[in-house]
């Protein structure tokens, strides 16, 4: 019965180590996705510390690949030292992922205030020229999120760009995709996106942070199972002389 439990634990442990390799790739992808998306929205969110969970999640992903390798070798070879190292590293990574989850929730709560403060500045500096990074960021967000202005398209009337152009129109990025003849004129509001960008940017950034949180939680649960199986094998190996002889190839006298 005990040997059956050991075999089952070892089988699950080897399978989990294979999952760790897949998890390593997924975590690195999630972290990279956060970096790429942040680059598109960085003008609306000035707190670079928001990227800390993404940096940690990429580091955890790289470490999980190494953990999977150590775990497979230690499990197959029945190495007590290897399994102990495996459990300790898994525990450290588990704690790190808990920290990622906490940081994720902290920064997710800060998103709304950060965006509200930053988006006002960005819209005020809009000048409609392609070389200007802030202007490109606004046009990109309005096209991607199908929005116009901070709260709605009327916000453009309070910008310096609108007052300087004096043509009673908003940027072409405010035009609906279905409005083929749209020139941004406020005289044809039905051609413009009605929803403001602030709420949608906040929603997008919070969704990104939730991807990090859920990824960390999911793989933390898998790591708990891995630690449990490794501990079962370790404890059985330490307490059962017969099992020790079976591993080393010895026999009873």
Curated annotation (Swiss-Prot):
Glycosylation sites (chain numbering): 127, 152, 167, 183
A GO cellular component entry from the record: plasma membrane
Coiled-coil regions listed: none
Topology in the lipid bilayer: Multi-pass membrane protein
Transcription regulation recorded as keyword: no
UniProt cross-references to InterPro entries, sorted A to Z: Tetraspanin/Peripherin, Tetraspanin_animals, Tetraspanin_CS, Tetraspanin_EC2_sf
Intracellular or extracellular location(s): Membrane
Stretches assigned to the Cytoplasmic side: 1-11, 72-85, 234-253
Segments traversing the membrane: 12-32, 51-71, 86-106, 213-233
Extracellular topology ranges: 33-50, 107-212
Alphabetic keyword roster: Glycoprotein, Membrane, Transmembrane, Transmembrane helix
Family recorded in the similarity comment: Belongs to the tetraspanin (TM4SF) family.
Subunit-structure text: Interacts with claudin-11/CLDN11 and integrins.
Role played: Regulates the proliferation and migration of oligodendrocytes, a process essential for normal myelination and repair.
Stated name of the protein: Tetraspanin-3
